Amino acid sequence: RGRIAIDARFDLHGHTQHSAHAALLRFIERARADGCRHVLIVTGRGGERGGVLKHSVPRWLQEPAFHRHVIAFHEAGPRHGGTGALYVVLRRPRG
């Protein structure tokens, strides 16, 4: 029914904002090099304020370091974490 398989998942729970940025970039680079096209990034929903990573990750994915690997991203469906996760579509690997 139009569902796309998730090739890889990355959970940012337990990361600080600083460590999450570096770890996410490494994950995205590795996933793309491995030929993954559709990945799931779990940010968590955060507390009452909505969570730092939940708001930071979409901004990061638009930075040049990430954008060179990322085609698009959007909020995950309920079965994959809903507002606490993102589907990310990666560019095809080079070569």
Label every PLM stretch briefly.
Residues 1-38, 43-95:
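Long, charged, low-complexity intrinsically disordered regions
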